């Protein structure tokens, strides 16, 4: 089936194939970092399901790499992923003197590169959080230029138009 069984202390956890990063291969003895996605009880005992594709996983990786997140100076407000390809995280600083993007990137990219390496080369964009949904979406899609944005209140969605030549960077 392609699932991996991971020893976590005295118990075993399952990392399903669909929760692994695409094209990621694991071998016996590999050290694995993963997010505990679900813990449940079955007739055979307790089951622990791990994930390496969850947006929560990237949040936890940044907490490990960026002490300012763990200390509460910087907060990850949102995260979205296309596992193995790209991810975006939205960050906010609770201290005006601290640049949330620069802090998450680190000196010469050291912090973000450590997370990228753990995620098998997944490209990570870090954007500034904005409480205004329209402004947040415009910022999240940079460097693409947003031509128009329409908020659809009833479905809590937005229609965003960018030029076709900007589509790849959006």
Give, region by region, the residue ranges found by the protein language model.
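RNA-contacting regions in translation and RNA-metabolism proteins
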Residues: 1-170
């Amino acid at each position: 089936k392609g699932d991996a069984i991971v020893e976590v202390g005295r118990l075993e956890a399952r990392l399903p194939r669909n929760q692994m990063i695409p094209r990621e291969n694991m071998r016996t003895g590999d050290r694995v970092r993963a997010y505990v996605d679900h813990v449940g009880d079955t007739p055979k005992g307790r089951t622990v399901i791990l994930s390496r594709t969850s947006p929560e996983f990237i949040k936890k990786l940044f907490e490990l790499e960026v002490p300012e997140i763990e200390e509460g100076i910087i907060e990850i407000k949102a995260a979205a992923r296309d596992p193995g390809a790209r991810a975006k995280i939205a960050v906010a600083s609770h201290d005006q003197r601290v640049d949330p993007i620069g802090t998450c990137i680190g000196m010469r990219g050291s912090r973000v590169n450590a997370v990228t390496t753990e995620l098998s080369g997944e490209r990570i964009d870090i954007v500034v959080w904005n409480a205004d949904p329209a402004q947040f979406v415009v910022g999240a899609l940079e460097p693409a230029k947003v031509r128009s944005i329409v908020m659809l209140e009833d479905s809590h969605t937005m229609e965003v138009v960018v030029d076709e030549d900007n589509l790849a960077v959006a």
